[in-house]
Amino acid sequence: MAKQIGIDLGSANTLVYLKDEGVILSTPTVIAIDKNTGKDLCFGAPAKKMLGKTPDTIKVSKPVREGVIADMDDTTLFITRLLEKTELTSFFSRPDAYVCIPCKATEVERRAVQTAIYDAGTKNVSLVAEPLAAAVGAGCKVLSAKGRMIVDIGEGTTETAVISLGDIVVSRSQKIAGATLDRAIMNYFHNERRIEIGELTAERLKIKIGVAHPKINRGEYRVIGRNLNNGMVIASVATSKEIYYAIRPALLSIVHQIRLTLEATPPELTSDICNNGIILTGGGALLPGIADYVSAELGVKVAVAPKPLESVCIGIGKMLESDGELAKILNKDI
């Protein structure tokens, strides 16, 4: 019998779940390729460290952007190396793969994921709606008639969905997420400080001192960038309050999406959500104060999942390990 794996193919990180073993790998969705030979040099964390630092002969690719495949060849190569590292593929063995995708992905985007994963060395490829997997991984009773709302704030997209009786009732997807916050920080330094900083520096600022409320103080962080006035290297200090004001417009957009989803939700399910609250998953859920921020804006209880970064992958795993109704979700058309 073929092995069964779950794959959370994210814009920032890719996680792999192996049935009967759990999450066996989590690595950045980045691959470095030699332009002259077309061969890959490394992938994951080593490749991510090369972003913005390579000569013209090396391409560092982030093949998944805004939740979908941006470069088919690079994605296939990345997944191939990923599966080789986990020793899940061989000439005699190809695993069955269950892959999460945004609920609003187009037919073309879905086929691209299936093709890339199959070409990387899997046998059968099935697609699973990302918010549904996130809800299961967050511990929600998705088979219940009571409505639950899940907000998965990833790197490339924010998925908002209302779930009841094992399926998605209402959903929205927008391309304002973790990467948007990074760009907002870069733009803030460009416009307000006249300092150019890189993508990794912006991400580091978000992680180290980013907040979703101005009253939360996470201190300061030293930044090194390029002075746009004279082109020289400059060292500066950023505060958590500055980062908040830089990312606040993006946070408001995420709240607006949640509000629109609530407005489109049937009244009985809205009542359930008011009683049960909203669950946040994804890397964006780790931003200090975001649950309180969303709750204050919407007037609804909001909580962060126990393991927000792994919720989607854990959710696929729970479905794979289940012998009951939960397992049937894996085979639903989405």
State where each predicted segment sits.
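Nucleotide/phosphate-binding catalytic cleft detector across ATP-hydrolyzing
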Residues: 1-155, 161-278, 285-334
